[in-house]
């Protein structure tokens, strides 16, 4: 079964590196945006297994184009379409915090499951959910940890006084997964969010043993 990686222009550099590591060709997805904001998506090439690469920051703009690309890939003969989204959007809200709110995590999981046969992402924001599979509507979902790559990147340039700092309790598992292999101390702060862009961060004093 032939496989290829397909990428939008905004992720071309990262996608090219990934395609090289996987030993598959990389193809471009072209987007034309009309004056009213609609997007025309055109996929270059085809494959039986299509790996669609796009990080979903700026999700309201990118999600529709990703779904259109998935449809075009299937129309072009793809039997399997796998989404590779290094950043997976709308994962923060896993419960309604106030009456009338949508649970975005569940909605986006079902939406992606309707169009893709599998998903790969990096360190998704899963606070109260045990695994990514639980919200992905039955398709295989792989959450890759960035910790090994980060450990490798910083291991050769560490000061003996280095401390790994996390902003809040939710960050502790990520911080510890990097600090532990390097033998580093960990410091976790407390975060109080006062608005979308206003955050108060308190970091406790630290004394080495």
Labelled PLM ranges:
Residues 1-209:
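PRPP-associated nucleotide enzymes
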